[in-house]
Amino acid sequence: MMPSFCLAGTLMMALFLSSLRPESLDPCVEVDSNTSYQCMDRNLNKIPDNIPSSVKHLDLSFNPLKTLGSHSFFNFPELKLLDLSRCEIETIEDKAYQGLHQLTTLILTGNPIQNLSKGTFSGLANLQNLVAVEIKLASLDSLPIGHLVTLKKLNVAHNLIHSFKLPEYFSNLTNLEHLDLSNNYIQTIYYTDLQTLRENPQLNLSLELSLNPIDFIQPGAFQGIRLHELTLRSNFNSTNVMKTCIHNLDGLQVHRLILGEFKNERNVERFDRYVIEGLCKVTIEEFRFTYANEFSEDITDFDCLANVSAMSLANVYLKRLEDIPKYFKWQTLAVIRCELKQFPPLELPFLKRLIFITNKGATSFPEVNLPSLTFLDLSGNGMSFRGCCSYTDLGARSLKHLDLSFNGVISMSENFMGLEQLEYLDFQHSTLKKATEFSMFLPLEKLLYLDISYTNTKIDFNGIFFGLTSLNTLKMAGNSFKDNILSNVFTNTTNLTFLDISKCQLQQVSWGVFDTLHRLELLNMSHNNLLLLDLFHYKQLHSLKTLDCSFNHIETSKGIMQHFPKSLAFLNLTNNPFACICEHQNFLQWVKDQRLFLVKTEQMTCATPVEMKDSLVLDFRNATCYVQKTIISVSVISVLVVSTIAFLVYKFYFHLILIAGCKKYSRGESIYDAFVIYSSQDEDWVRNELVKNLEEGVPPFQLCLHYRDFIPGVAIAANIIQEGFHKSRKVIVVVSRHFIQSRWCIFEYEIAQTWQFLSSHSGIIFIVLEKVEKSLLKQQVELYRLLSRNTYLEWEDNALGRHIFWRRLKKALLDGRAWNPEGATEAENNQQETTTSI
């Protein structure tokens, strides 16, 4: 029974644990440590208990909270942003937000709130931004926010509001800057609706009324009203309604007026000049007109807008824009995506900023006269310039900002004469011609920003950037250099702080390229073909903070890693084919040690060897190299030892045989008195002199001679050792010129040395048969040294010399010989008998 009971308990526990949702255990994601938590869409029906009191940003959106009880967030006194979007909240009890004194942003979007009592928003002493979009709000009166005196932005868009009447409590909201009433059901605007604003002229309110179906504005409704911004987009269902309503804006003072429609909300079929004429009684500082399909040809009469400081036309279909009077006080003109067929010939003495972008119909730049112009943006038009760039080409002497990016072919024929005030210059994604034929930027000593990225420029002239002594930002990505080598083109740009040379097909970097860029903070060399990370190139970049070498062909580094500038904070080496081999062990270990300093080390993968392909560089283990080094070291040492032994065995094979023989014959008696080593060229002397005087003399000596005593059929070397050395007491070495030149003689002599060492007594007798030149004798170093230090016999072919020679030789041979008196007497008698008979 017990096992069954345990099994049932285990199954019940498993079922219980499986029924728990993961989010119920740890429902929120910690975005920033103890300050930001994301609990979106976790099926929560209450505030989680495990959120710390230090939280500042809390996202509870898309959870079925249903109800917010009193003091729901009392535990989060540091909270600054609270997102309760689409939490199905129907009821918010009084003091629900009590204790949130630091809260600045509250988002209630998409909650079907049934009732908002006076105490709903109590406790929000510092609230600045309230988002109450799509909460089924019927009127502004039902929103109890009169006490939120710190409120700056109120967004009640997409509700059920029909009346534009601003409640009296707005007079308390003295800090309110933006009111968004867009996408409601406001149809009419009356004079009394704005009475609160008239009574509180200190308000500087921006009012968003777009997407309300306005069909009537009471004449004079905006009389005496001053606004920072008024936006009316896609409000009118016909041209006539729009004209009437615009005319009834008379008396309004507004800093910025925005009219028009949205891209996907087009109601007005055609715009004519009467729409613009309705603005003559409105005081406007800036005017923007957006998204208009059809414009009458006579709408170019902008006299009612002559005194605005900024004029903007965006996505307005204009066939032409010309004949703008000189007296217009426009300081800014922006024409954006208006499909103009040609650039307007402008002559506006007050104009300071001209933005003419993405108008694909205008392909050339006409003559203009804009003496006050400081900002010119002509990007994205597809224009071509046959000659550029000087004052006569652009009609402006005071230019500080020039943007010619995303255009066609720009032929550089002049070096910006008359444009010496330029501080910003952008050519990116236009095609530059003749850019490297001369120092085209030479007069631009004040230029701070230059972008020639993707201009099809091949840089083969080191003086291209001469004159740019103040430049701090240089972007030249997507171009190329001669022979794909980064040359010394930055010697004059000593104030650079930002340099982008990515996608330039670079394979090498010349020495000293960056040596003058001591202020450089960011260097982008990504998407090139560099093979090595050569640290010496960056040694002089004392201010460098960011280096991007990603997407190259870098396998390892070159140089000492400490040569990196100490100021460097971010290094990106991702997407390089690293070689994770022991040869690069130091670099790979450095990557591990600097993982916090390197960008996205988890994306740094190995390309080689095959077994580590696509594995992380961080997974490389140094222990593998130590094992391999140990194996290699042991293998090398073993091979060396075996080779040495083999060599020694080969070289001293006969010496070893001699040693073995010495052990074998050490206890036996010698057969011969001496083994004679000599050259075959000296054999006559050996037979006629040496043998005759020693073997036939008194006392007689028995010599071992190879021609007489060696055993036939046995190897010469074996005979030398076994018959010569092992069976002889002494060794006689007959030294001559022939002896020194004979390899066999030298071999026999070396064996004799070993034999003498093993026998532990002086057993070698040297006979110098003839005078031998020292130079020849020195070829055999050991023999020369031995003859220099030891006594030897020298053959002299005269009576006295012979007598002394034979006496000394016999005495040497008798040394160590066992004495036999009878044998000696018999030998002496035999010698006397022989003499008598003769």
Curated annotation (Swiss-Prot):
All copies of domain LRRNT, residue ranges: 26-53
Keyword NAD found: yes
One GO BP annotation of this record: cellular response to amyloid-beta
SMART domains: LRR_SD22 (SM00365), LRR_TYP (SM00369), LRRCT (SM00082), TIR (SM00255)
Domain LRRCT as annotated: residue spans: 576-627
Signal peptide (residue range): 1-25
Transmembrane segments: 630-650
Subcellular location, record wording: Cell membrane; Early endosome; Cell projection, Ruffle
LRR repeats mapped onto the chain: 54-75, 78-99, 102-123, 126-147, 150-171, 175-198, 204-224, 226-235, 372-392, 398-420, 421-442, 446-468, 470-493, 495-516, 519-539, 543-564
SUPFAM superfamilies hit by this protein: L domain-like (SSF52058), Toll/Interleukin receptor TIR domain (SSF52200)
PTM comment: Phosphorylated on tyrosine residues by LYN after binding lipopolysaccharide. Ubiquitinated by RNF128 via 'Lys-28'-linked polyubiquitin chains, leading to proteasomal degradation.
Cytoplasmic side: 651-838
GO molecular function: identical protein binding; lipopolysaccharide binding; lipopolysaccharide immune receptor activity; NAD+ nucleosidase activity, cyclic ADP-ribose generating; protein heterodimerization activity; signaling receptor binding; transmembrane signaling receptor activity
Keyword DNA-binding annotated: no
Keyword annotations: Cell membrane, Cell projection, Disulfide bond, Endosome, Glycoprotein, Immunity, Inflammatory response, Innate immunity, Leucine-rich repeat, Membrane, NAD, Receptor, Repeat, Signal, Transmembrane, Transmembrane helix, Ubl conjugation
GO CC annotation, single: lipopolysaccharide receptor complex
All ranges on the Extracellular side of the membrane: 26-629
Disulfide bonds: C28-C39, C280-C304, C388-C389, C580-C606, C582-C625
Domain TIR: 670-813
Membrane topology category: Single-pass type I membrane protein
Annotated glycosylation sites: N34, N115, N172, N204, N237, N307, N492, N495, N524, N572, N622
Family membership: Belongs to the Toll-like receptor family.
Assembly notes: Belongs to the lipopolysaccharide (LPS) receptor, a multi-protein complex containing at least CD14, LY96 and TLR4. Binding to bacterial LPS leads to homodimerization. Interacts with LY96 via the extracellular domain. Interacts with MYD88 and TIRAP via their respective TIR domains. Interacts with TICAM2. Interacts with NOX4. Interacts with CNPY3 and HSP90B1; this interaction is required for proper folding in the endoplasmic reticulum. Interacts with MAP3K21; this interaction leads to negative regulation of TLR4 signaling.
Domain notes: The TIR domain mediates interaction with NOX4.
Functional note: Transmembrane receptor that functions as a pattern recognition receptor recognizing pathogen- and damage-associated molecular patterns (PAMPs and DAMPs) to induce innate immune responses via downstream signaling pathways. At the plasma membrane, cooperates with LY96 to mediate the innate immune response to bacterial lipopolysaccharide (LPS). Also involved in LPS-independent inflammatory responses triggered by free fatty acids, such as palmitate, and Ni(2+). Mechanistically, acts via MYD88, TIRAP and TRAF6, leading to NF-kappa-B activation, cytokine secretion and the inflammatory response.
The protein, known as: Toll-like receptor 4
Organism: Cricetulus griseus (Chinese hamster)
